[in-house]
Protein backbone atom coordinates (compact mmCIF):
# COMPACT_ATOMS: atom_id res chain seq x y z
CA UNK A 1 0.00 0.00 0.00
CA UNK A 2 3.02 2.33 0.23
CA UNK A 3 4.73 1.59 -3.08
CA UNK A 4 3.68 4.92 -4.59
CA UNK A 5 5.32 8.33 -4.45
CA UNK A 6 6.70 9.89 -1.27
CA UNK A 7 4.11 12.62 -0.86
CA UNK A 8 5.63 13.78 2.44
CA UNK A 9 8.71 15.29 0.81
CA UNK A 10 7.74 18.93 0.29
CA UNK A 11 10.87 19.46 -1.83
CA UNK A 12 9.21 17.24 -4.45
CA UNK A 13 5.46 17.77 -4.01
CA UNK A 14 3.14 20.54 -2.82
CA UNK A 15 -0.58 20.01 -2.18
CA UNK A 16 -2.84 23.05 -2.54
CA UNK A 17 -5.90 20.80 -2.35
CA UNK A 18 -6.72 21.01 1.37
CA UNK A 19 -9.77 23.19 0.71
CA UNK A 20 -11.50 19.91 -0.17
CA UNK A 21 -10.26 17.46 2.49
CA UNK A 22 -12.08 14.38 1.16
CA UNK A 23 -10.69 14.92 -2.32
CA UNK A 24 -7.25 15.62 -0.86
CA UNK A 25 -7.37 12.32 1.04
CA UNK A 26 -8.46 10.42 -2.09
CA UNK A 27 -5.67 12.02 -4.12
CA UNK A 28 -2.90 11.41 -1.60
CA UNK A 29 -4.05 7.82 -0.91
CA UNK A 30 -3.81 6.97 -4.61
CA UNK A 31 -0.43 8.66 -4.98
CA UNK A 32 1.05 6.90 -1.92
CA UNK A 33 -0.07 3.46 -3.02
CA UNK A 34 0.18 3.25 -6.81
CA UNK A 35 3.47 2.08 -8.32
CA UNK A 36 2.26 2.75 -11.89
CA UNK A 37 1.72 6.42 -11.08
CA UNK A 38 5.02 6.48 -9.16
CA UNK A 39 6.84 5.34 -12.30
CA UNK A 40 5.12 8.06 -14.35
CA UNK A 41 6.07 10.67 -11.75
CA UNK A 42 9.64 9.43 -11.27
CA UNK A 43 11.19 12.77 -12.27
CA UNK A 44 9.21 14.37 -9.44
CA UNK A 45 9.51 11.56 -6.89
CA UNK A 46 13.30 11.65 -7.26
CA UNK A 47 13.31 15.40 -6.82
CA UNK A 48 14.64 16.45 -10.21
CA UNK A 49 11.64 18.74 -10.63
CA UNK A 50 8.74 19.85 -8.40
CA UNK A 51 5.03 19.12 -8.81
CA UNK A 52 2.21 21.14 -7.25
CA UNK A 53 -1.35 19.76 -7.08
CA UNK A 54 -4.16 22.30 -6.97
CA UNK A 55 -7.81 23.02 -7.70
CA UNK A 56 -9.21 25.62 -10.09
CA UNK A 57 -12.64 26.46 -11.44
CA UNK A 58 -12.79 25.40 -15.09
CA UNK A 59 -15.33 24.77 -17.81
CA UNK A 60 -17.44 21.64 -17.32
CA UNK A 61 -15.79 19.90 -20.27
CA UNK A 62 -12.35 19.98 -18.61
CA UNK A 63 -11.41 17.52 -15.87
CA UNK A 64 -7.83 18.56 -15.20
CA UNK A 65 -4.70 19.82 -16.91
CA UNK A 66 -0.95 19.67 -16.41
CA UNK A 67 1.49 22.44 -17.22
CA UNK A 68 4.79 23.90 -16.09
CA UNK A 69 5.51 27.38 -14.76
CA UNK A 70 9.24 26.91 -15.19
CA UNK A 71 11.50 23.99 -16.09
CA UNK A 72 11.65 22.86 -12.46
CA UNK A 73 8.07 23.67 -11.39
CA UNK A 74 5.11 21.71 -12.78
CA UNK A 75 1.43 22.01 -11.88
CA UNK A 76 -1.35 19.42 -12.02
CA UNK A 77 -4.66 21.23 -11.68
CA UNK A 78 -8.06 19.58 -11.11
CA UNK A 79 -11.43 21.12 -11.88
CA UNK A 80 -12.84 22.34 -8.56
CA UNK A 81 -16.39 21.76 -9.87
CA UNK A 82 -15.73 18.03 -9.52
CA UNK A 83 -13.99 18.15 -6.12
CA UNK A 84 -16.92 18.33 -3.70
CA UNK A 85 -17.43 17.77 0.02
CA UNK A 86 -17.97 14.10 -0.88
CA UNK A 87 -14.69 13.95 -2.80
CA UNK A 88 -14.16 13.53 -6.54
CA UNK A 89 -17.62 13.56 -8.08
CA UNK A 90 -17.80 13.25 -11.84
CA UNK A 91 -20.04 11.24 -14.20
CA UNK A 92 -18.37 7.87 -14.73
CA UNK A 93 -18.94 8.07 -18.47
CA UNK A 94 -17.63 11.65 -18.41
CA UNK A 95 -14.90 13.51 -20.18
CA UNK A 96 -12.43 11.69 -22.41
CA UNK A 97 -10.05 12.81 -25.15
CA UNK A 98 -7.93 9.70 -25.68
CA UNK A 99 -10.60 7.14 -26.57
CA UNK A 100 -10.38 5.34 -23.22
CA UNK A 101 -13.19 2.87 -22.48
CA UNK A 102 -14.79 4.58 -19.50
CA UNK A 103 -17.24 1.71 -19.02
CA UNK A 104 -14.36 0.09 -17.09
CA UNK A 105 -14.75 2.75 -14.38
CA UNK A 106 -17.06 1.58 -11.58
CA UNK A 107 -16.74 4.31 -8.89
CA UNK A 108 -15.84 7.98 -8.64
CA UNK A 109 -12.63 6.94 -6.85
CA UNK A 110 -11.72 4.88 -9.91
CA UNK A 111 -12.57 7.88 -12.10
CA UNK A 112 -9.99 9.87 -10.11
CA UNK A 113 -7.39 7.13 -10.66
CA UNK A 114 -8.01 7.38 -14.41
CA UNK A 115 -7.79 11.20 -14.41
CA UNK A 116 -4.69 11.20 -12.20
CA UNK A 117 -2.95 8.61 -14.40
CA UNK A 118 -3.88 10.56 -17.54
CA UNK A 119 -2.35 13.73 -16.07
CA UNK A 120 0.69 11.84 -14.77
CA UNK A 121 1.33 10.63 -18.34
CA UNK A 122 1.27 14.27 -19.49
CA UNK A 123 3.65 15.25 -16.68
CA UNK A 124 5.97 12.38 -17.59
CA UNK A 125 6.03 13.33 -21.28
CA UNK A 126 6.69 17.00 -20.50
CA UNK A 127 9.47 16.12 -18.04
CA UNK A 128 11.17 13.78 -20.54
CA UNK A 129 11.06 16.43 -23.25
CA UNK A 130 12.19 19.31 -21.03
CA UNK A 131 15.07 17.23 -19.65
CA UNK A 132 16.33 16.61 -23.20
CA UNK A 133 15.61 20.23 -24.19
CA UNK A 134 17.75 21.58 -21.34
CA UNK A 135 20.53 19.03 -21.92
CA UNK A 136 20.55 20.20 -25.55
CA UNK A 137 20.86 23.82 -24.44
CA UNK A 138 17.43 24.35 -26.06
CA UNK A 139 18.63 23.43 -29.55
CA UNK A 140 16.05 21.68 -31.71
CA UNK A 141 18.39 19.25 -33.51
CA UNK A 142 20.27 18.47 -30.32
CA UNK A 143 16.98 17.79 -28.48
CA UNK A 144 15.90 15.47 -31.30
CA UNK A 145 19.19 13.57 -31.11
CA UNK A 146 19.11 13.20 -27.32
CA UNK A 147 15.56 11.82 -27.38
CA UNK A 148 16.51 9.43 -30.19
CA UNK A 149 19.65 8.27 -28.36
CA UNK A 150 17.56 7.61 -25.25
CA UNK A 151 15.36 5.30 -27.29
CA UNK A 152 12.24 7.41 -27.70
CA UNK A 153 10.24 6.65 -30.82
CA UNK A 154 9.76 8.95 -33.78
CA UNK A 155 6.09 9.23 -32.79
CA UNK A 156 7.05 10.47 -29.34
CA UNK A 157 9.51 13.01 -30.77
CA UNK A 158 6.82 14.15 -33.24
CA UNK A 159 4.74 15.36 -30.28
CA UNK A 160 7.25 18.16 -29.79
CA UNK A 161 9.02 18.62 -33.12
CA UNK A 162 7.16 19.08 -36.41
CA UNK A 163 9.00 16.80 -38.83
CA UNK A 164 7.62 18.69 -41.85
CA UNK A 165 9.00 22.06 -40.78
CA UNK A 166 11.73 20.97 -38.33
CA UNK A 167 10.29 23.50 -35.89
CA UNK A 168 8.83 23.14 -32.40
CA UNK A 169 5.15 22.25 -32.44
CA UNK A 170 2.72 24.89 -31.16
CA UNK A 171 1.13 24.36 -27.74
CA UNK A 172 -2.18 23.54 -29.43
CA UNK A 173 -0.61 21.03 -31.83
CA UNK A 174 1.45 19.52 -29.02
CA UNK A 175 -1.72 18.91 -27.03
CA UNK A 176 -3.38 17.21 -30.02
CA UNK A 177 -0.26 15.13 -30.74
CA UNK A 178 0.11 14.03 -27.14
CA UNK A 179 -3.50 12.89 -26.89
CA UNK A 180 -3.16 10.98 -30.16
CA UNK A 181 -0.03 9.30 -28.81
CA UNK A 182 -1.80 8.43 -25.54
CA UNK A 183 -4.76 7.06 -27.51
CA UNK A 184 -2.41 4.63 -29.30
CA UNK A 185 -0.05 3.64 -26.51
CA UNK A 186 -1.25 4.51 -23.02
CA UNK A 187 -4.59 2.79 -22.45
CA UNK A 188 -2.71 -0.18 -20.97
CA UNK A 189 -0.93 2.14 -18.54
CA UNK A 190 -4.26 3.47 -17.27
CA UNK A 191 -5.60 -0.10 -17.05
CA UNK A 192 -2.58 -1.12 -14.96
CA UNK A 193 -3.00 1.81 -12.55
CA UNK A 194 -6.71 1.01 -12.18
CA UNK A 195 -6.02 -2.69 -11.58
CA UNK A 196 -3.43 -1.88 -8.93
CA UNK A 197 -5.83 0.53 -7.23
CA UNK A 198 -8.51 -2.18 -7.09
CA UNK A 199 -6.06 -4.66 -5.60
CA UNK A 200 -4.90 -2.14 -3.01
CA UNK A 201 -8.34 -0.96 -1.90
CA UNK A 202 -10.63 -3.95 -2.41
Regions found by a protein language model. Give the residues of each.
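Predominantly extracellular/secreted Zn2+-dependent metalloproteases
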Residues: 1-110, 125-202
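Short alpha-helix carrying the canonical HExxH Zn2+-binding catalytic motif
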Residues: 108-121
